[in-house]
Regions:
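Interhelical loop/hinge segments that connect adjacent transmembrane helices in multipass membrane
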Residues: 2-18, 182-186, 195-241, 284-298, ...
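Interfacial segments at transmembrane-helix termini and the short loops linking adjacent helices
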Residues: 14, 19, 116-133, 320-352
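Membrane-interface junctions at transmembrane-helix termini in multi-pass inner-membrane proteins
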Residues: 15, 127, 137-160, 346-375
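Signature of the first transmembrane helix
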Residues: 16-74, 169, 229-255, 382, ...
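Membrane-water interface segments that mark the loop-to-transmembrane alpha-helix transition
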Residues: 20-33, 58, 63, 71-117, ...
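Transmembrane helical elements of multi-pass membrane transporters/channels
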Residues: 20-36, 157, 163-168, 183-204, ...
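Hydrophobic alpha-helical transmembrane segments
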Residues: 57, 134, 158-208, 377-380, ...
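Helix-loop junctions and terminal segments of transmembrane helices
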Residues: 70-86, 267-291, 360-363
């Protein structure tokens, strides 16, 4: 009997599409991290520390611009695909609208960067590196990860991502040898990604029989307008999650910034976990909520408490191993970094507490609630983190970032009870039946 239960449990676990989605999303993130770790010493050796810094600075600008290119479609796209995955005509219009809209935003972002460089003479130290980096905007625009998320078929996109990163690594080895070739680093990354993405779009067209229509301008405008709140929400969330180091830079020394930055980077890698949970389960959650509230509640409850258990384990493990992790990465004993990491180790756990709220927002397509919660959070995070950083430095900022995760839980729970009381009450009332 026990063998039968165990076999059923583990067999069902790995056959579950949401679990597969999660595994493949983690594979994508892991491959990105591994390739970054491999490429860093190669680039530093080839283009020097200064060139490496300018390449990363350009990449930071592109990452911010990619928020505009994504325009919230990475959140809304999977939902639309999940709801219409059996209607190829509807899918064709969804894919066409999203791809063309993102390409349009990439063109506008590129125009903005060109004007900033040649019209306003900004980014003086790395203008040409940044200009050659704009290909990454079109790589982002054509990446159909949202489509495969909605279909809950992530295997192909994860393999394609690994292959594009290997092409990038090969390009670095073959073509980047001197500091004056710095401008080609991000260009190679963008070209590899864009090339693989075009092959994926061809696969979608020919193998999955999805047609590409040329949308009318009014359709593109309507699509962008519909996603405007998600775009603004993403901006606020990005600042709230990633703005801590900038806040600390106003009050701390370079040494403190360096030690906090090391701990924060580790924390940010761990914080990917709750995001991956949300992205992997919400396409199926959307379909379940539309068809059967009871099944939705059971599914969400399992995912929610499962993610809490995993994140608790990861946080406690990181807390215990903090001295060894810092020693491994810095090659020296940085007691201050260890203190920061032990505090920030609980950021992913606190973030996981809000998974259920966010999934409900996304499943019900409540962009306004996402917008309100993210901007209320930003209005909380900035003064609190500024104040705590001013009085207590890195320790204060760590407390501020932890409180930010708890505050967003409170904000989203209140909004959920106001707008989705039926779903939230069903979720909590059914806990005892697990």
């Amino acid at each position: 009997m026990i063998e039968k239960i165990t076999s059923h449990t583990f067999g069902g676990l790995f056959k579950n599409k949401s679990i597969q989605n999660f595994i493949f999303l983690i594979t994508i993130q892991a491959s990105n991290i591994v390739i970054t770790l491999i490429s860093m010493p190669l680039l530093i050796q080839s283009i020097g520390v200064d060139g490496f810094g300018l390449v990363n600075l350009s990449l930071s600008v592109i990452i911010l611009a990619n928020i505009m290119v994504g325009f919230g479609y990475n959140l809304s796209g999977p939902r639309e695909v999940a709801l219409h995955q059996n209607d190829k005509e509807m899918l064709s219009h969804i894919v066409s609208n999203i791809v063309f809209s993102k390409v349009l935003m990439a063109l506008l972002a590129t125009l903005g960067i060109v004007v900033a460089i040649f019209g306003l003479n900004m980014f003086r130290e790395y203008q040409w590196i940044l200009l050659f980096s704009v290909l990454l905007l079109f790589s982002e625009a054509t990446l159909p990860i949202w489509f495969f998320q909605g279909l809950e078929k992530m295997k192909l996109i994860s393999i394609a991502n690994v292959f594009s990163k290997l092409l990038y690594l090969l390009g670095i080895v073959l073509f980047i040898h001197t500091p004056d070739q710095s401008k080609w680093v991000n260009f190679i990354m963008g070209a590899a990604g864009l090339g693989i993405n075009m092959l994926l779009l061809l696969y979608i067209h020919y193998e999955l029989e999805i047609k590409f229509y040329k949308p009318k301008f009014i359709q593109l405008f309507a699509s962008l307008k519909e996603n405007g709140l998600l775009f603004l929400s993403n901006i606020a969330t990005h600042i709230s999650v990633n703005g801590g180091l900038i806040v600390l830079s106003f009050f701390a020394s370079a040494a403190t910034l360096g030690m906090f930055s090391l701990a924060e980077r580790i924390s940010m890698v761990l914080r990917v976990f709750p995001s991956m949970v949300i992205l992997s389960i919400y396409p199926n959650a959307t379909k379940l909520l539309k068809d059967d509230l009871r099944k939705f509640v059971v599914f969400l409850r399992k995912a929610y408490f499962g993610s809490l258990v995993v994140s608790l384990f990861v946080s406690l493990l990181t807390f215990a191993l903090a001295p060894y992790i810092i020693q491994l990465l810095s090659k020296t004993n940085l007691a201050e970094s260890v203190t920061y990491l032990r505090m920030l180790a609980f950021v992913p756990l606190f973030a996981c507490l809000n998974v259920a709220n966010v999934v409900i927002f996304l499943a019900r397509d409540q962009k306004e609630l996402m917008f309100r919660s993210s901007w209320i959070l930003l209005l909380y995070m900035l003064p609190v983190c500024f104040g705590l950083s001013y009085f207590y430095g890195g320790i204060g900022l760590s407390y501020g970032l932890l409180s930010t995760e708890l505050m967003v839980l409170i904000i989203c729970t209140i909004l959920n009870f106001q707008k989705n009381g039926d779903v939230l009450k069903a979720f909590w009332m059914n806990i005892n039946s697990v």
